Amino acid sequence: MAVSSKHIPAPDLHRVRRALLSVSDKTGLIDFAKALHANGVEILSTGGTAKSIAAAGIPVKDVSEITGFPEIMDGRVKTLHPAVHGGLLAVRNDPEHVAAMEEHGIGGIDLAVINLYPFEEVRFKGGDYDTTVENIDIGGPAMIRASAKNHAYVATVVDPADYADVVAELEKHSGSLPLAFRKKLAAKAFSRTAAYDAAISNWFAEAIDEETPTYRAAAGKLHSVMRYGENPHQTAGFYLTGEKRPGVATATQLQGKQLSYNNINDTDAAFELVAEFDPARTAAVAIIKHANPCGVAEASTIKEAYLKALACDPVSAFGGIVALNRTLDEEAAEEIVKTFTEVIIAPDATEGAQAIVAAKKNLRLLVTGGLPDPRAKGIAAKTVAGGLLVQSRDNGVVDDLDLKVVTKRAPTEAELNDLKFAFRVGKHVKSNAIVYVKDGATVGIGAGQMSRVDSARIAARKAEDAAEAAGLAAPLTKGCVVASDAFFPFADGLLSAVEAGATAVIQPGGSMRDDEVIAAADEHGIAMVMTGMRHFRH
């Protein structure tokens, strides 16, 4: 049953006479405590926070002095006491609450400055189970929630970035804080505890291999506010979850304008794709537009891989994202800057390459320090009206699959290498996806069509256009291989690929008409490999 309210109006300005400071992150703590003391605020504190404040010569009272109870159980129990929570939760102009405070000797607390044990940091650094559990804060969230609920009389500060604003408001209002400001702090406080609990619940689900927990929480911390979202009439913000997976969220931006919503989405897609290629084996480049690849290639150098990728669809590459699986060097940088590019993302960049890119001041250059592991577990989520779709990350890798040759002719070694390449790329193309590959480079990509045969035709037409632009008589698809992200429901998609010049095919299989498709391949002397794994992408 819901708890009813007494409807006691909150004061607009509430005087801050007493503050409780208990922080794990001590950034800015001493200057803030000095400012509170200068504004006549009595400071209560706990453990290490109290020691730091006292060491700076600022008067401070340990919370055990008001509870009459020492910290026990390795600090697990120190603020879970009525003298603390009564001071945070009391409604100051409710006679019953005031009487209870007087009867039990509870003093009001007007400002709660709390930040939490670094659970998220320990979690993502790979702390062992017991260490991670020990970093689950109990008293901190309890105090934050208590003070934020009672924002009519208590201001709650959970972020050192807000210290300056608190001091400014205190000085502006002669030692008081306005209700609107207290509400703003309370909203932030509840979002902080929600994010903290989300991190804990998600970690526990992973720890016990619970893939579909009864409750699923998602949370992140605001990193930046976008100028707009996918379109100018949409608002947007970029939130970080704390996951250390190398990519756009963890990258260092060395130069260029602020990343837009679409930049971030496309850059993530590009870097996840290029990470499919082991840098110890080959250099690889992916060029992305609207989260779909325009061209992907591998070679002995990044420069060569870039030029091969660009040749696939140089028109669409204009204004695209370029992702590398190796360090950006001077030779590659000189080629990339010849075409208008929004973002370059790479594990690293040489000083010479950075100097070349610097000539294009708006070009964003990101370095990540590494590549994401395509085999790593993770989750992918999508919102729908009234719900959240959550699934495991598509971490299937073609090198790990049991490939089956289903035609009379087996692919040659060169064809098989290109087939695997094409299937890696197809995993990152919006469905229905058809990818033509020759000599370690895409030569035609068909994406996002409602019918597979249309994707095959579009990819072939793009290959013809690219050949014409390069002054070649034959289409780039002549003698190529083709990958499909899902099975061919009919032979028509395969026949379109054959017509384009493909000599070998890789696809998941699983259609009720597989025999018909295989027969068509045999009739045309095509080698076909089935993977048993589909890569739909929507």
UniProtKB/Swiss-Prot annotation:
Residues 6-158 form the MGS-like domain. It catalyses: (6R)-10-formyltetrahydrofolate + 5-amino-1-(5-phospho-beta-D-ribosyl)imidazole-4-carboxamide = 5-formamido-1-(5-phospho-D-ribosyl)imidazole-4-carboxamide + (6S)-5,6,7,8-tetrahydrofolate; IMP + H2O = 5-formamido-1-(5-phospho-D-ribosyl)imidazole-4-carboxamide. Pathway: Purine metabolism; IMP biosynthesis via de novo pathway; 5-formamido-1-(5-phospho-D-ribosyl)imidazole-4-carboxamide from 5-amino-1-(5-phospho-D-ribosyl)imidazole-4-carboxamide (10-formyl THF route): step 1/1; Purine metabolism; IMP biosynthesis via de novo pathway; IMP from 5-formamido-1-(5-phospho-D-ribosyl)imidazole-4-carboxamide: step 1/1. One of its GO terms (biological process) is 'de novo' IMP biosynthetic process. Its EC number is 2.1.2.3, 3.5.4.10. GO terms for molecular function: IMP cyclohydrolase activity; phosphoribosylaminoimidazolecarboxamide formyltransferase activity. It comes from the Bacteria. The keyword Membrane does not apply. Keywords: Hydrolase, Multifunctional enzyme, Purine biosynthesis, Transferase. GO terms for cellular component: cytosol. PROSITE patterns: MGS (PS51855). Disulfide bonds: none annotated. CDD domains: IMPCH. The keyword Transferase applies. Gene3D superfamilies: 3.40.140.20, Methylglyoxal synthase-like domain. NCBIfam families: PRK00881.1, purH. The IMP cyclohydrolase activity resides in the N-terminal region. Belongs to the PurH family. This is Bifunctional purine biosynthesis protein PurH. It comes from Brucella abortus (strain 2308).
